[in-house]
């Protein structure tokens, strides 16, 4: 893995700073299908997710890998947080979630150009009490 790719990905994983993204970046939560385009829109999404919907959110990084030939980085992590605000129309439940996630990042010129985030939406909804446990 190029050191620059690893540095950018790990910096973002620790900070969730929208400045890690290129101005014209694209962020896709694959479970939702609709990409978020542009750093400002990504910043709004990150604020909603990490400060409003899950005010104590954190990610426990498990693995970081990359394809050095294409400046692709991959992070496997577990997202933890207490649901304290509206998320996709679901009012705060106070429930704690623990969701396995995988992020795929395309890095260019020291910034994230594209992110695709994979996770199981049904697991998230179950943990929020929106789907039956089985």
Roles of regions detected by a PLM:
Residues 1-134:
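C-terminal and inter-domain tail/linker signature
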């Amino acid at each position: 893995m190029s050191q620059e790719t690893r540095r950018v990905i790990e910096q973002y994983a620790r900070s969730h700073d929208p400045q890690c993204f290129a101005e014209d970046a694209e962020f896709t939560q694959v479970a939702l299908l609709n990409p978020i385009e542009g750093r400002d829109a990504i910043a709004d999404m990150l604020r909603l997710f990490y400060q409003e919907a899950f005010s104590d959110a954190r990610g426990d990084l498990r693995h970081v890998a990359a394809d050095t030939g294409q400046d692709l980085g991959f992070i496997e992590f577990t997202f933890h947080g207490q649901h304290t605000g509206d998320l996709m129309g679901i009012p705060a439940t106070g429930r704690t979630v623990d969701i396995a996630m995988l992020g795929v990042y395309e890095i260019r010129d020291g910034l994230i150009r594209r992110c695709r985030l994979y996770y199981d939406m049904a697991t998230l909804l179950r943990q929020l009490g929106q789907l039956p446990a089985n």
